[in-house]
């Protein structure tokens, strides 16, 4: 059976007038309008001409746009809401703050950083600030919070984007985030059902199943979703994640070949989520360009299958003409039932009614705050102060086994060498970060202001790339043939700080060491020069440098984070962060420090 929505019940709680609007709106739709209302558009322009044209052509229900300046986003959303026939859901990815809605918004911190403050108040503040800044420019939905469990340190997608590894903490912080953002008129779509963070692959690029048994899943992810549903969670994003062992227990007659990811799987969405867990809200697919979805079925089939399986909104067109045609064909040939089509429309329109969008007919411009008033809510001193507090409280001293290494003062360590440690450099991340101030430059400035002499090491590969092409082969050969005195390091530096800046962007989230031998590129010198490692992105860098005795997770390289880091290194501030994940990565050697006093 298909579980149909009850708009009078949680999370909608609609009155008769609102339900009448939902039903009358559906009754007055053409088939093309009904099909259009299944889609979430990703716009390629903010111009009025483009926005009005695509709304007329494709009649979509919702938008998820790329962030821009608040002034531009306000204009975009004003056009969308005043020119659309039916009010639009306008979503952003406010996972870490208002910066997910507008580029001049406030980043409070990724979820793992918020969790490291060890204070649920900051999860609420994250939601609240994100809600204030997003709603100011006309957003009314967000694809957050992330409720995955960080149980595999090799996972490249949610390493710093999830609250942590423990069920209770994820529940507590997700509820607080939801409370903060819903207070400000934003519908949260929690993700990624049925649960990421167990497999080490990226469902943007590959299948990435969750291998849990049903009892394991019910005690972990199932419990998280049950608690959030009970708390009134209005939206869920279905990930392109298989749940094969759970599905096999529910349907022993099925083979693995019969099983699809959750975004295309009626058993997982209708029987499990809506049936056993009692979810009555709306479901959006994760992005439909991801290989976890596109490699599962021909696109002509996966479009109607996603809706028939229980999704109410389909995230992003590929080619809009093609996608709309195929969704309509799927309805006409029975792949998408009339019952499921109309249930999806009720759930989506129900969210719009829950937000009160139906009450603005004839005065749509009043949905938006006046522009000047809206822009005054972006990047306020209050929001920046919350971000500063999180930066101060979150930084975590994970490993501190070198006796008396801290504090870092000019009297103890006059000459400091900063060594940048990086990962995959390709992809869009490299293009986006071009020209941005590096964490090492910011750290250098702050340390020099305190009286240190600071150098930044140019890694061996980068140096060789600058040589004339004909000289490079000999230089590379020399890397492996040459040896150099340790005194080249010990005579010149009193302290070395390895700054690990490795973020997602490839199939793996690991340090990629440059070709080098005897240079500071890799921290072989931990017993030659006092050495500190600081990760300014993902919290699992210790796996690739277990030999170090002092390791710190800063979680990001925001200016206030680097400033707080320097205060803590110097002893002016205490380390108070508490890791919500296993920074030792379940490995034995990451906890070891070979003291120089051994064997004496």
Go through the PLM ranges and name each one.
Residues 51-66, 125-142:
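Catalytic domains of carbohydrate-active enzymes, especially glycoside hydrolases
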Residues 70-87, 120-136, 341, 346, ...:
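Active-site-adjacent structural elements in enzyme catalytic domains
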Residues 41-47, 92-100, 140-150, 190-196, ...:
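Short glycine-enriched loops at secondary-structure junctions
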Residues 30, 72-86, 98-100, 165-340, ...:
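Second-shell residues forming the walls of enzyme active-site clefts
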Residues 2-10, 14-100, 147-161:
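Short, well-ordered alpha-helical
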